[in-house]
Amino acid sequence: MADTTGRIPLWLIGTVAGIPVIGLVGVFFYGSYSGLGSSL
């Protein structure tokens, strides 16, 4: 696990990819809760 030279750390990928995913999921659930997500 220590051989990460020349490669992007997995936690960094998870963080960068996780933030927009959480945002999209939050917007989707908020939209569906507000009655706007049914159009999706």
From Swiss-Prot:
Topology within the bilayer: Single-pass membrane protein
> What are the UniProt keywords, alphabetically?
Chloroplast, Membrane, Photosynthesis, Photosystem II, Plastid, Reaction center, Thylakoid, Transmembrane, Transmembrane helix
Q: Which GO terms describe its cellular component?
A: chloroplast thylakoid membrane; photosystem II reaction center
Gene3D superfamilies, A to Z: 6.10.250.2070
The compartments listed are: Plastid, Chloroplast thylakoid membrane
A GO term (biological process) for this protein?
photosynthesis
Q: Which InterPro entries match?
A: PSII_PsbJ, PSII_PsbJ_sf
Pfam families in the cross-refs: PsbJ (PF01788)
Segments spanning the bilayer are 8-28
Q: Subunit details for this protein? A: PSII is composed of 1 copy each of membrane proteins PsbA, PsbB, PsbC, PsbD, PsbE, PsbF, PsbH, PsbI, PsbJ, PsbK, PsbL, PsbM, PsbT, PsbX, PsbY, PsbZ, Psb30/Ycf12, at least 3 peripheral proteins of the oxygen-evolving complex and a large number of cofactors. It forms dimeric complexes. Detected in both etioplasts and green leaves; PSII is only assembled in green leaves.
Q: Briefly, what is this protein's role? A: One of the components of the core complex of photosystem II (PSII). PSII is a light-driven water:plastoquinone oxidoreductase that uses light energy to abstract electrons from H(2)O, generating O(2) and a proton gradient subsequently used for ATP formation. It consists of a core antenna complex that captures photons, and an electron transfer chain that converts photonic excitation into a charge separation.
Describe the family membership recorded for this protein in Swiss-Prot or TrEMBL: Belongs to the PsbJ family.
What's this protein's name? Photosystem II reaction center protein J
Q: Which organism is it from?
A: Hordeum vulgare (Barley)
